[in-house]
Amino acid sequence: MTTILKHLPINQRVGIAFSGGLDTSAALLWMQKKGAIPYAYTANLGQPDEEDYDAIPRKAMEYGAEKARLIDCRKQLVAEGIAAIQCGAFHNTTAGVTYFNTTPLGRAVTGTMLVAAMKEDGVNIWGDGSTYKGNDIERFYRYGLLTNAELKIYKPWLDTDFIDELGGRHEMSEFMIQSGFDYKMSTEKAYSTDSNMLGATHEAKDLEFLNSSVKIVNPIMGVKFWDENVVVKAEEVSVRFERGYPVALNGVVFDDSVELMMEANRIGGRHGLGMSDQIENRIIEAKSRGIYEAPGMALLHIAYERLLTGIHNEDTIEQYHANGRVLGRLLYQGRWFDPQALMLRDSAQRWVASEITGEVTLELRRGNDYSILNTVSENLTYQPERLTMEKGDSVFSPDDRIGQLTMRNLDITDTRKKLFSYATTGLLSASAEVGLPQVDNNNLTARGLQDKSK
């Protein structure tokens, strides 16, 4: 049985994720006029560019909603954001600058909490504003059906009747005016923006062209750090974690995780911390480009990973990064609550995050330019006296190191034999000029090798 409805279900309750913008306003009014019974659901995700959440449900009622609800998703959103930091669930990076998966995290929370609210109201048909070319249509599809097995999906933007009548923003605006609503289109920007309290995404339109840089973006969570006319003063900041959870900023303890994230955003935003420009692979494997803001997530991530490197051993850190990349991709694909993701999340939170206790002090400057000034933790395994170059008691002696190096002879001998085996088969060629294998004309050559075993 299909779960996607191609045409509007008449005389049935249809839930719509309602933002109050032109698209969802026109869609709600159109559905009501065509005979559906629209229910409007708005997620309060702490969007930095939203001024009056309470006005949004009132708008929905004016446009014909049978019922309109505002769902506070902020606490759950911050919880999922902190979980992502604990697990390093980020797979899109460019030259060490990270995209913190803030939109996928928002979709995971919105897709589950709004559908749960609809289910309470006996609404089993859901629509949202995602287009068929993007990631969100699949994310919402997965999270919606995970939350309500009886759910049917109706999207006006997949309905040819809706598209024929209201296929563009001009047509939607005219429809609203003709219906008695003095709805003026907002000024068109050179790109589109989607945000929640974890971060903002700027994409599409002019940003689809790679010769349009971050300089055309007006940040909504930070400053134009690239503009030398913008004054950005260096600032010293401390971040404290207890058992993997951020608890204090600049010595101020926060009992409310939402308030802590908001303050982290304010601190990082003053410097433009956490902005990145990424070319990424969408779920459908086509590449897209986005410019992202995430000042609070970046600040917490830097402090968390600093403690991580001082507390855990190399193999644990390697596994954390490897699993984090896999988990980040699952999150991006809308699989944050799938068993394979839960398994990776549980292992990272149970065995890695639980040991992350301590405080990191940083100096923030412009953009992603910062220095770590101090790291303090009762769990640090970093102990400088073990490797001090000064005289004094040491945990091991020169004779101990000689013995350790002697043991390396076993694998060095095996490796040398392998290299000569490769030379015998023609994979490597030998020369007396250079003593190391190197690439030459697309072939790896071993020069100057002498088989000491013969």
From Swiss-Prot:
The gene designation is argG
Entry GO terms, CC: cytoplasm
Q: Which GO terms describe its biological process?
A: argininosuccinate metabolic process; L-arginine biosynthetic process; urea cycle
The broad enzyme category this protein falls into is ligase
Keywords annotated in UniProt: Amino-acid biosynthesis, Arginine biosynthesis, ATP-binding, Cytoplasm, Ligase, Nucleotide-binding
The record's listing under InterPro entries reads:
Arg_succ_synth_type2_subfam, Arginosuc_syn_C, Arginosuc_syn_N, Arginosuc_synth, Arginosuc_synth_CS, Arginosuc_synth_type_1_subfam, AS_cat/multimer_dom_body, AS_multimer_C_tail
Instruction: List the pathway annotation.
Output: Amino-acid biosynthesis; L-arginine biosynthesis; L-arginine from L-ornithine and carbamoyl phosphate: step 2/3
Record-listed E.C. numbers: 6.3.4.5
**What GO MF annotations does this protein's record show?**
argininosuccinate synthase activity; ATP binding; protein homodimerization activity
Subunit relationships: Homotetramer.
Specify which residues bind L-aspartate according to the UniProt entry for this protein: T131, N135, D136
Q: Indicate where this protein resides in the cell.
A: Cytoplasm
**According to the entry, what is the taxonomic lineage of the organism?**
Bacteria, Pseudomonadati, Pseudomonadota, Gammaproteobacteria, Enterobacterales
Ligand binding (L-citrulline): Y99, N135, R139, S192, T201, E203, E280
Catalysed transformations (reactions): L-citrulline + L-aspartate + ATP = 2-(N(omega)-L-arginino)succinate + AMP + diphosphate + H(+)
Its family remark reads:
Belongs to the argininosuccinate synthase family. Type 2 subfamily.
| Biological source species | Yersinia enterocolitica serotype O:8 / biotype 1B (strain NCTC 13174 / 8081)
Positions with a binding annotation for ATP: A17, F18, S19, G20, G21, L22, D23, T24, S25, A43, G129, T131, D136, D194
The main place the protein resides is: cytoplasm
Alphabetized PANTHER family for the sequence: ARGININOSUCCINATE SYNTHASE
The name this protein goes by in its record: Argininosuccinate synthase
Source superkingdom? Bacteria
